[in-house]
């Protein structure tokens, strides 16, 4: 089924963005939803994957939900709205897995639930689909050591350190840096506030003038770091390692301001989540691995492969 009509609805009171697939003649027998954890550009690519899966599956209708303020409370309101509409399956990236486990368990008693991007392993979700974030953190850790062969002090930035994907990436980084000459000063969180994300970096550059590296764990942290470093006139003096494929991050990799970025494959998050939900709703449980995890591998983007990767991402974003 095609996303032949796309509606952007600003929900009063909590500004949740909703992108709806229109119903095909006669109605779809499987209604599923993909719920993000914030409004980052990262999810634009995931939406393309959802749209492609929706086109391929004749009996599926997909709703794509974006909690613009990135809170667990807004995710709950979105889910309640989906349940009221009679949704059959939900793929959600929980903002705060530990404190949302009960919510996920309640939902799982009513409809099929999988987690994507950020897992809640203690919940009753049917499966997790996404990155092995510990492994991705280890990749970032190796890049930090590579960028700082003489060692140095680094600061880590993230939206919410309580999010499982953030915790696991940080765990992987710490494991890899253990015993090295690199010292982690601390982790600064911004609660998905982009202005605060940049000010956290600016404050760090002032408070720790000897800082050698800045690490961003979430997609928008890369541009926040880059812009703060540029404003401080320290491009080239501080090594930047980040995650995901924001435009500014990729441009920074191309011009050398960003050493490298570890990218996920959000298109596959969307595409495979919809297909997985459709198969499970059709009664096929064989698609769930024994460990209940479907891992989508991460990629390392550096100066030598950034042009090719950027061209691919731009195609997915509909830019050419």
Q: Where are these predicted regions, by residue range?
A:
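Flexible loop/turn connectors
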Residues: 235-236, 243-301
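Hydrophobic alpha-helical
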Residues: 91-107, 173, 185, 191-252
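Hydrophobic alpha-helical segments within soluble ligand-binding/sensing domains
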Residues: 27, 75, 129-154, 196-198, ...
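Short, low-complexity disordered leader/linker segments with a strong preference
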Residues: 1-31, 105-109, 319-320
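Hinge/cleft segment of the Venus flytrap/periplasmic-binding protein
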Residues: 22, 157, 161, 165, ...
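Flexible loop/hinge segments that line or gate small-molecule binding clefts
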Residues: 97-135, 143-146, 153, 244-254, ...
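Extracytoplasmic "Venus flytrap"
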Residues: 31-57, 63-77, 87, 93-97, ...
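Short, solvent-exposed amphipathic alpha-helices that sit
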Residues: 42-56, 60, 136-140, 164-182, ...
